[in-house]
Amino acid sequence: MTHTTASIPVNLKSPGQVLASMGFIEAADVLLGGVEAHFDWSEAQATFVLRADGDRNPFEVVLEFLSRARLSELTPIGYVEGGAADGDDSGEEDATPGEPEDGDESDDDAPGEVRGRVTTPAFPSGEGDRNALPIYLVSDGRRLSVSHWADGSSRDAFKLYSGNRSGSRIATQMLSGVRAKPKKSQSSGHLRNRGLQQLWLEQRAALLKEPFDVVTPMGGSFNFDPRGAWTTIDAGYSPNTQKDGIAASPVVEILAAIGLEHARPDQYKTRSVRYAVWGHPLPPMLGRAALAGADLKLPMRRFQFELELSGKNKITTFAQEETQP
């Protein structure tokens, strides 16, 4: 069996980039198999190293899949839209910067668009919430599940977004960007914000070399990339009210969501979170344990960060490395 190993730069103090590395692990495990991964901090620029079956760069395989993927939402048996447990109807404003108003976006049928709902008897929580329905990412007969925000187990769901946005809508924007409603003379509206799909077409070489470092103005996101974070200050200016996009990475955002499918960082107290990286190749199952800080008797580095509040949203901040006792 042929195996291919590739590496990309990673900022170990960025929770989003470490979670996105987990996303590459999870996606490559489904798409290719034979996955082992680790972090290499022997040089000034740390790297994330990924090995998978086959003769193609595993990062390229994952990014290409995501550039073509379509979304389906999952609902439990008996799900009723607008039920008592369905959605956040408090009417409070979500403070995510640059989020387009409802009705201002195009619903073109393109990669990344929601293609309907699938009823499943195996639902991760007791009732469905329209703002937190699990999704499938589907392309060429293969699919990835993204459902951490709907986790009804005792495990921390690590859902950071809030307000009247849905997981599927945010995922759609991270993949296919945001377009305005087309005018009468247009077949499609102008592009407000780029997603992974546009970046793959326009900056493929850069994405393959440094996928976490290609940033673009974004509106609402899952709040994993701390470069896109902001908190409200009483200074007479808000990127939300001004509708300015803040530069961050849709690649980090969607891959971090995928990376949380089977793993969680350790939220050891309210809004205080720990995670770890490991320096020896591990299969996905052990990598998930290592992320949460399990002592695997391997070279490891541990980090801690705070979740700040931005309106009703939680947002990541850059981490500090914990000193070893």
Residue ranges and their predicted role:
Residues 1-178, 301-325:
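Extended, helix-rich scaffolding/adaptor regions
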Residues 158, 165, 175-182, 188-190, ...:
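Extended amphipathic alpha-helical scaffold segments
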Residues 188-194, 198, 202, 206, ...:
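Short, functionally important secondary-structure microenvironments
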Residues 216-230:
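Active-site-adjacent bridging/hinge elements
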Residues 231, 235-325:
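Domain-exit/linker segments immediately C-terminal to small folded modules
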